[in-house]
A protein has these predicted regions:
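Conserved acidic residues
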Residues: 2
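A conserved beta-strand element that flanks and buttresses the S-adenosyl-L-methionine
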Residues: 5
């Protein structure tokens, strides 16, 4: 395949390195790309949850997340570790959207007029500046040797 996209899939895998290895060895073409996005353990919403005592540490998998199939919560370091273990080469890394609130809080706010388009644009721009603090992190990878 020339392009493989895994968006919020890898955190559901019991053996993510195995899947990434299969992509590298069997599925991705010589000039192909893997686009990989996962939830970010270091998102401010998770860091706040730690400070509130809702979760023990940033990368903790909550009961609700586990019930939805999550097996890991990635940081850039742990995501890059798994990608490199699988033999893939990382060509780009970034984040998607700065988010200080939990999903249920966003859902409630978006049903009001409190959140403006300018605020959303500000969060987007902040995410470009601080990808390590975005709600999701992503890597673009190429086939390794």
């Amino acid at each position: 395949f020339n392009n493989i996209i895994l968006t919020h899939v890898l955190e559901h895998m019991d053996d993510p390195v195995y899947l990434l290895g299969r992509i590298n060895e069997d599925w991705i073409s010589e000039n192909g790309r893997l686009f990989l996005a996962v939830p970010n353990a270091n998102a401010p919403s998770r860091q706040i949850a730690v400070k509130m005592g809702l979760i023990d540490f940033n990368a903790a998998v909550t009961k609700s997340e586990f019930d939805h199939g999550h097996r890991i919560t990635y940081t850039f370091d742990t995501l890059e570790r798994d990608v490199k273990k699988a033999g893939l080469n990382i060509v780009y890394r970034s984040g998607v959207f700065f988010k200080a609130l939990a999903n249920f809080q966003w859902d409630q706010l978006l049903n009001t007029d409190i959140i403006s388009k300018d605020y959303l644009e500000g969060c987007y721009q902040l995410g470009l500046q601080y990808p390590e603090l975005c709600s999701s992190i992503f890597l673009v990878c190429e086939k390794g040797k």
